[in-house]
A protein has these predicted regions:
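C-terminal regulatory/interaction regions
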Residues: 67, 71, 90-204
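His/Asp/Glu-rich metal-coordinating catalytic cores
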Residues: 1-110, 129-139, 162-164
Length: 204
């Protein structure tokens, strides 16, 4: 929100704590709206269950998934404690307005497979993440079947490769489709690149 940041700058700022994760990446980060459009195009072609896994802390991505669920006529269900926690916190802070209400997973499992979309934690293959439990068949409410689609709307954090590839191998063995940033445009970083940071410092 360029105008809002400029107004903050006009009031006078003594110090600012800023995200510098992608400071060494030249140029600008990709647009979340472009990812949203790409995800929608992908989901419109799917006829069975869709499960998207992403970082729970990426509220913009969460909003994009809710948007896609509504546009494709699907109900949405959140899976994983941190996903529920971030959703509630974001709503409390005034974000995620005008979205469809998520279903409890116990309700969601009764929905026709072409009418449900899950948003789950565990995109890095974490042993206790929701994705691992779903894929291993140990989740009490959520399951996947042959022909369903899993979208990894995230990047691999260095060091997590083995865990994640083991998880994805298990998904493939179950004849479930995998879509990730390796074969489709389903993720942009939530961290600003160098030129984005220059703009923000200039505005503030």
């Amino acid at each position: 929100d360029e105008e809002k940041l400029k107004k903050i700058g006009e009031t006078g700022v003594s110090a600012m704590i800023c995200d510098s994760t992608n400071i060494f990446n030249a140029g600008r980060a990709g647009s979340e709206s472009d990812v949203r459009d790409s995800l929608l195009q992908i989901m419109e072609l799917k006829t069975k269950r869709i499960l998207v896994t992403s970082f729970a802390s990426n509220v913009a991505r969460m909003e994009s998934i809710f948007y896609c669920a509504k546009k494709t006529g699907r109900s949405i269900s959140l899976v994983g404690r941190s996903m529920h926690r971030i959703f509630k916190a974001a709503k409390k802070c005034g974000y995620l307005k005008g979205l469809i209400e998520p279903l409890d997973p116990r309700e969601a499992k009764r929905i026709a497979k072409n009418k449900i979309l899950y948003l789950a934690t565990g995109s890095q293959g974490e042993p206790m993440g929701a994705m691992n439990r779903i894929v291993s068949g140990s989740h009490p409410e959520v399951f996947l079947e042959e022909g369903d689609c899993v979208i990894f709307s995230s990047k691999i954090i260095p060091g997590n490769e083995k865990k994640l590839y083991n998880l994805q191998n298990q998904i493939v063995r179950n004849n479930i489709e995998i879509i990730s940033e390796e074969n489709a445009f389903v993720h942009v970083s939530g961290h600003p690149n160098r030129d984005d940071l220059k703009d923000m410092y200039k505005w503030v």
